[in-house]
Amino acid sequence: MFGIFSRCDVRVQAAVTQGMQLKTIRDTGGYEFGVIWEPTLRQGSVLLKGEESFTLADIAMWRDLICTIEGVQVIATIWSAHSNIETHIPRMLVTFDAGGRKCDDFLTWLAKRLVYVYSPDQMELMWWPQEAEKVKEYASSLWSPDSKPKFPPIAELLKERHSAIQCDSAYRLAFEVLLTASMSEDIVQEFEQLVLSSELRDGEEIHFVELLRPTDPIYLEYHEDAQRYRLDGVVVISSTSHDQCEDFATDLVNSLSAHARVRLTRLFGRQHIGVLLAGGLPAYGWQHNEVFVTKE
């Protein structure tokens, strides 16, 4: 999923975010929302916030509906737990293919369709489109928690080593979860429950991101037995020191079933990809293969 090592660099802003632009538009439902526009990739992403009352079954049903909407390229479900926050509110990052449209044309196109994403007619469920300021704040809370929120986020202190990344005062580790559509349901539920039931020590966080890529509908027309989507997963854990973060990682691995454990791998050299995804930024590993590691 996350490609190969391609280069090393030292930055306080991830290279994959440098072309991202944060736009604002109002949709037909009257909501103002932020759109992350990526001109090189010709895609735009919106961040949606759910309710604590949403069940895992609700979210799975909603995603099945959203997969069929024109232009939907990726649906990323973000579950988070923090030591100082008792609620667990899911977020969704939905990325759309602009289909060759220029930015203004794409935003107009998206404004007419987004209501069918956050409030589909077939379900009594509504997500809340996040305004540009909320998108900026949430992304900064992962990448630059002690710095002033900016977009793209810039950390005052950032050190990425081969196995860990320090974002300001927070130390983070990222893992990839190897999933397949045919055998992922139990594993996904295990990681979701891990986040929802985690007993965290002071300063600890855990994030699980499930990435769903719908199969091209034209392809499905001619291959009825094909999988409707591809799945990948990312886990990001955080603490106040590197040693505590490693202890957290050990506890996490030991708490998993053997079946889930063998599908968990460290994102060596690519910790930044996991952190950005957990922060609601479309830094998809199959689109970006940059690596940067701090030289001692």
Predicted regions and their residues:
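Extended, folded cores of ATP/NTP-driven motor/assembly subunits in large transport
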Residues: 1-296
